[in-house]
Regions:
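Small-residue-enriched, tightly packed secondary-structure blocks
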Residues: 26-192
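Bacterial N-terminal signal peptides that target proteins for export
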Residues: 1-10
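Exposed boundary/loop context
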Residues: 4, 18, 77-80
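C-terminal segment of classical bacterial N-terminal signal peptides
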Residues: 15-23
Length: 192
């Protein structure tokens, strides 16, 4: 029994080292990109996330069509007793097409070990909610109820306080968008 636990712990440690190394390599690759290349990568990731959201989810697509605007963020979260993460994203007013590039960051303390990569999609019901998010930033204080079920399951969300929020992982849509403790703000370097 003790030997099995040691093997599991060793396997987990190796997996974390490999995952962390690849994450750090991706971060270095990101830093070497020029501003326009970063924008293009963010735009591509946002479109991929929106496409993934709409697959088998007509309610999300309907809310998107009714929305004033949207934002998509790509996040990498590391947890080793402490958790921290961050990422980049873009907010876009649907009618005008105007884009604002943004950042996100999160930190916390809790039980956890691993790396989690996911996208968060915000749909904004009206211009006031969208403009407040973009101009003033936003901090999530609690876990936001997001979508129902496993990959491909139809989301049952609607706008709440002017927003609908979805979290997409490699497993598909998640039952809750765990964005507590996450702050969103304008990326000064990418909006020049």
């Amino acid at each position: 029994m003790k030997k099995k636990l040691t093997l599991v712990a060793a396997g987990t440690a190796i997996a974390l080292v490999v995952s962390t190394a690849s994450s750090l390599a991706a971060e270095e690759s990101w830093k070497s990109l020029k501003r326009e290349s970063k924008r293009m990568k963010i735009d591509e990731t946002a479109q991929d996330a929106l496409n993934a959201l709409f697959v088998g989810n007509p309610k999300a697509e309907q809310l998107f069509e009714m929305s004033y605007g949207w934002a998509v963020f790509d996040n990498l979260k590391l947890a080793f007793g402490f958790s921290g993460g961050g990422g980049n994203g873009v907010a876009k007013a649907r009618e005008s097409g105007e884009k604002t590039y943004m950042q996100m960051g999160t930190a916390g303390i809790g039980i956890g070990l691993g790396i989690n990569k996911y996208q968060v999609v915000f749909l904004f019901q009206d211009s006031r909610t969208f403009e407040n998010f973009v101009e003033k930033g936003w901090q999530a204080e609690a876990t936001a109820s997001a979508v129902a079920g496993e990959a491909g399951a139809e989301a049952k969300t609607d706008f709440s306080n002017g927003m609908a929020i979805y979290q997409i992982t490699d497993k598909g849509l998640m039952a809750f968008a765990d964005i507590a403790g996450t702050k969103y703000w304008k990326n000064k370097k990418l909006n020049k």
